[in-house]
Amino acid sequence: MQRYISLSVSLSLLSGANALVRPDGVGRLPALGWNTWNAFGCDIDASKVLTAAEETINLGLKDAGYEYINIDDCWSVKSGRDPNTKRIIPDSAKFPDGISGVASKIHDLGLKVGIYSSAGTETCAGYPASLGYEKIDAESFAEWGIDYLKYDNCGVPTNWTDTYTHCVPDNSNGSKFPNGTCPDISNPAPTAYDWSSSNTAQRYNAMRDALLGVNRTILYSLCEWGQADVNTWGNGTGNSWRTTGDITPDWSRIVEIANENSFLMNYADFWGYPDPDMLEVGNGNLTLEENRAHFALWAAMKSPLIIGTALDSINEEHLAILKNKPLLSFHQDPVIGRPAYPYKWGYNPDWTFDPAHPAEYWSGPSSTLGGTLVLMFNSEDSAKHRTAVWSEIPELKDSAEKGSGYRVTEIWTGEDLGCVKDQYDVELQSHDIAALVVGESC
């Protein structure tokens, strides 16, 4: 039996000891940007990418901190590489001026540009990928002006698969994971196996080394779905690393991923962040409350916040969520790298692994908010009360005696709730989340 992460693990473990530190602070804080995939899949072209870049400015998202405009899969000629140079060839029907032409226009707007490849022979959509061509592709990306690489895990040949299987309790790998364990896993690794020596780690390290060898700083986003215990080596390889299979704009999938990622917060700090996948805010049939909870949890976990909706048709409510100043301020804290941690599970006993009901009570210190970030989440399917008790919150409990009061601000509305004694109770609609800044004592 393998356990995803010890459910009694202390959330005070050191992280970042072997972090990938890049010039100019690139990758020190979790990325903010936009990506083509969730909105358009393979149906991409220069016009859609440039429209997103322009709307990032027009809608105030650039001013809010979003800076990367990322091109996902399907940007190249599908038939193969240039027979002479061995370079990947941008699809001229989609990108008449090449990737470099799009990158130049995005840079002229004061933004950065990202590209996609995979650590295999083909991308997930069947386009040429980078395994064995890491140096050539890194050089191409640098010459084109690329600032960000999302590196997927498709097209892996059999000689590059891992000897052992790591437990990732995600629905893409089955459905039976009692409290975060994988009792049915085939070929588990021996105790104390060093996953940094695995074939998966070697494939991703090869591209890391290629990127480090070019004369351009390129943020490196690993997309290998939590395999090969990436949490133990991802911070020395890339700036973020995916922890699960792909997200979808379905509430059940969003809370499943939130649950999985919540057990990995000890790995998040400056220069390295577990990545629960791109945002679905504005997509599918998610309610306003679900969009709000999705964003708040991702921001509190200091996940990369990569928008995945069409910006030229986004509504004001969804845009306001993506631009929420207090949550973005917490997310981009230049002094405190650690994310918010769950301090009470609420619906379940503490440390319960439940894909439908993640931890409901979160808190985190902040140097930018003038207090502690506190989240209360209703994971249930009907309206429920949730109560934040000051003496239960780790950042407050040493000073929160009976009768203690704190000045509290509600994050979604900006309302000053005044001096709140002992606790704060709120009724939340199904799947909604309350977000507070608990400030000075009063």
UniProtKB/Swiss-Prot annotation:
Substrate binds at residues 224-228. GO terms for biological process: carbohydrate metabolic process. It catalyses: Hydrolysis of terminal, non-reducing alpha-D-galactose residues in alpha-D-galactosides, including galactose oligosaccharides, galactomannans and galactolipids. Gene3D superfamilies: Aldolase class I, Golgi alpha-mannosidase II. It comes from the Eukaryota. Its main location: secreted. Residues 1-19 form the signal peptide. SUPFAM superfamilies: (Trans)glycosidases, Glycosyl hydrolase domain. CDD domains: GH27. GO terms for cellular component: extracellular region. One of its GO terms (molecular function) is alpha-galactosidase activity. It is found in: Secreted. Its EC number is 3.2.1.22. Disulfide bonds join 42-74, 124-154. Keywords: Disulfide bond, Glycoprotein, Glycosidase, Hydrolase, Secreted, Signal. The active site is at 152 (nucleophile), 246 (proton donor). InterPro entries: Aldolase_TIM (IPR013785), Glyco_hydro_27 (IPR002241), Glyco_hydro_27/36_CS (IPR000111), Glyco_hydro_b (IPR013780), Glycoside_hydrolase_SF (IPR017853), Melibiase_C (IPR041233). Glycans are attached at residues 159, 173, 179, 215, 235, 285. Belongs to the glycosyl hydrolase 27 family. Hydrolyzes a variety of simple alpha-D-galactoside as well as more complex molecules such as oligosaccharides and polysaccharides. This is Probable alpha-galactosidase B. It comes from Aspergillus oryzae (strain ATCC 42149 / RIB 40).
